[in-house]
């Protein structure tokens, strides 16, 4: 399943997602994030769908009698935070190699152009989620699955004010700020210290009441009915 940049899915104006943060195979906490669709619609939808993890990339064509295709699941689950900076930010989102070398999108891995919404949010506080851009060979700027989360409020001693030049804030952590504090304390630089490797565990989107409502099955003709009709128990 893939999406098109011309026909965006709609997860609502301010969808909410969660991410469990893992260290040494143990969950150290959960981040709850509210997203701002009006800041960057295509970027927000890409982020939401990657937390849901229900899109796939065909890795190779199958062989043999049944010719099964091999698929790679596009998801943030399992992604490492491959770039960290104390009192500044943590970076993740490489859904293929988990080292910052191969990000992607749910739009058939097509890059997302910088078509922003009507609102702009500066990098001024802790817990802001923003998308990290890259520049192609022609000098054009695009976005993909790479994101960062700020670890502190803006200060003269950090570089958050520089992020507004090309990164775009698409959300904010509203639950789990203590988890960010814990991460920040563990990446404080000391001589010869090796930073721990954090990764994303289980993640997903919170459904609103309309999305969470159970719907009746639909048959091939489009009529709503139960496909397996229950039988009476005597």
From Swiss-Prot:
GO CC annotations on file: host cell cytoplasm; virion component
GO BP, sorted A to Z: protein folding
Keywords: Host cytoplasm, Virion
Disulphide bridges, residue numbers: none
Domain (PPIase cyclophilin-type): residue spans on this chain: 18-205
Gene3D superfamilies for the chain: Cyclophilin-like (2.40.100.10)
Gene Ontology terms for molecular function: cyclosporin A binding; peptidyl-prolyl cis-trans isomerase activity
Ribosomal protein is among the record's keywords: no
Cellular localization per UniProt: Virion; Host cytoplasm
InterPro entries membership: Cyclophilin-like_dom_sf (IPR029000), Cyclophilin-type_PPIase (IPR024936), Cyclophilin-type_PPIase_dom (IPR002130)
Assigned protein family: Belongs to the cyclophilin-type PPIase family.
Subunit structure: Homotrimer.
UniProt-recorded name of the protein: Structural PPIase-like protein L605
